[in-house]
């Protein structure tokens, strides 16, 4: 039976994906959010989903309300629902109930969730009818689907309502210092989550913290080293992607190619292969569809403006920065790697300042944008982007949206824009600068 859903905070990456999924399943969907443009809204607009400004008038008694995790009692729509005792569900609670209708495949981990969820979704949907929800704002819903692939987020332990049949865990790392107290707290959260997985876990076997995880379901380890249950080996990394074989219990289960770059993407693919092997999916079909994966939004997304290569990536943690730069060097080994990075949240910048500097030193030159504070925090003046610049050994300087012209001081370069805030504003300024230079030279 068709329902009407109203999403409070519909532009959030998970929320927009869920909205698209429910829309495609035949339900009426609308939502509200701030006016500021966010990259997820294009997909919503293309689907014909109405996006409204926040207003009490948006809510009617016949609707099912789904509320984004960032929106609290100070939001006018949430306050209205509470005042009038209109029931609503948080995103993660709704998802926990929704997945019960499917055989579910979850992807958790500090880094690589979205890319791995995208890869798993791509392969499975090309083999059989599959619904999926990806953290880049992409979702697909089918009422006839047997399988459901989704991203499982550890922040504020939002993954605790989830009880999937299968789950990949890509890694454990200290992040979200505004919530987690340290690496032990992060590990404990993942351990609690792992205990809820029903059939099997697929865990990166070279992560010391992950190896401490215990769960009732079988745990399969994947990685590069002997001793793992699924081992990627005979690896060739080229400018066209990565080729490798995977063996399980001493037997080769397939030879694979992914048109993706960086060691981390080989690991992501190996996790997907391991999960689908245990789930009984034909490895020849898996190999066929791995070859055609085109990536996910804001994860090593490339464009060329007037012969200048620009890469856009969501990387906002030191581990992710290192992985993104590694991928850029694999694809463009003869080019200078110029990193343009915007720190995301003051708490993360303070907690990981030294690690950020070390990671950014992997680039040849570094430009920094002003720190992007989250809606949950206040700038107390405890850290400035200049503090990070001072710790970077490679050539570095701070740029503004209004003046990105220092980026032109490079020949034969690849420009890698990284961040989870509004780094795309800097990217767009640079693109406009390049376009104007071309016009002036004509």
Curated annotation (Swiss-Prot):
A GO BP entry: peptidoglycan biosynthetic process
Domain of life: Bacteria
Molecular function terms, GO-annotated: ATP binding; UDP-N-acetylmuramate-L-alanine ligase activity
The enzyme's E.C. designation: 6.3.2.8
Top EC class, one word: ligase
One GO CC annotation: cytoplasm
Cellular compartment(s): Cytoplasm
SUPFAM superfamilies, per the entry: MurCD N-terminal domain, MurD-like peptide ligases, catalytic domain, MurD-like peptide ligases, peptide-binding domain
InterPro entries (alphabetical): Mur-like_cat_sf (IPR036565), Mur_ligase_C (IPR004101), Mur_ligase_C_dom_sf (IPR036615), Mur_ligase_cen (IPR013221), Mur_ligase_N (IPR000713), MurCDEF_pg_biosynth (IPR050061), UDP-N-AcMur_Ala_ligase_MurC (IPR005758)
Pathway this chain belongs to: Cell wall biogenesis; peptidoglycan biosynthesis
Binding site for ATP: 109-115
Keyword annotations: ATP-binding, Cell cycle, Cell division, Cell shape, Cell wall biogenesis/degradation, Cytoplasm, Ligase, Nucleotide-binding, Peptidoglycan synthesis
Catalytic activity entry: UDP-N-acetyl-alpha-D-muramate + L-alanine + ATP = UDP-N-acetyl-alpha-D-muramoyl-L-alanine + ADP + phosphate + H(+)
Function summary: Cell wall formation.
Family: Belongs to the MurCDEF family.
Listed name of the protein: UDP-N-acetylmuramate--L-alanine ligase
Lineage of the organism: Bacteria, Bacillati, Bacillota, Bacilli, Lactobacillales
Gene designation per UniProt: murC
